[in-house]
Amino acid sequence: DSNYVHWAAAEKIGIEPLSDTRSHWQLRRPIVKVTTNPDFYLDTLIFSRPYLVPEAAAALHEIGSRFRDTLEVRGGGDYRIKVTSLLRTPQTVKRLRRRNRNAVDSSVHQLGTTFDISYAAFIADNAEHPRSVDDLKGILAEVLKAMREEGKILVKYEVGQPCFHITACDPKEQKPKESK
């Protein structure tokens, strides 16, 4: 999905871009703090802050949970996805643009609806059932594809920085589940 499509979806549920790191205390819409948990590992953040709107935080937890459930069904492996970016301010976007060719001034990360998940690094909580990075990447891609088809997220595969760029969608616009 293009940056324009991500931006249009993010505007529906996102926040106004923050003027600085303190302005998140005066928002018209709530944001929630994101921390490492059983569903995912939060990498050390340099160019973003650990906050998302509630819908994006819920989508991130669902991705992590589905990833771990799929691993279990396919023979096990105690791995978690690695989240590498969350909410950004205009200042952090400007700094990031000097290093990352994928970064743009109109970064949808500024709206609190978007996060990045690495497809090149996963967190192994134990080494009992080793899996290849390609296998883990494939499972993550399947989870993201399914959630995209359900209307829950938009996904962009980034190459320069090995990650999936994911934007949460408005729950009111998600596709109804088909009955079986």
Task: Kindly give the residue locations of the regions a language model identified.
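Glycine- and small hydrophobic-enriched segments that form the cores of compact globular domains
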Residues: T44, G76-G77, L96-N100
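Sec/Tat-exported extracytoplasmic proteins
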Residues: G64-R74, L87, L144-G151, D170
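Stable alpha-helical elements in mature extracytoplasmic
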Residues: L52-A59, I63, G77, T92, ...
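Extracytoplasmic/periplasmic, Sec-exported soluble proteins
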Residues: S48-A59, R88, S106-H109, E128-D135
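Acidic helix-start/capping segments at beta-turn-to-alpha-helix junctions
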Residues: G76-V93
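Catalytic cores and adjacent binding grooves of peptidoglycan-active enzymes
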Residues: V104-K180
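Extracytoplasmic cell-surface/polysaccharide-interacting catalytic and binding patches
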Residues: D1-L60, G64-L71, V159, T167-K180
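Charged, often glycine-rich, active-site loop that binds/positions anionic groups
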Residues: P90-D105
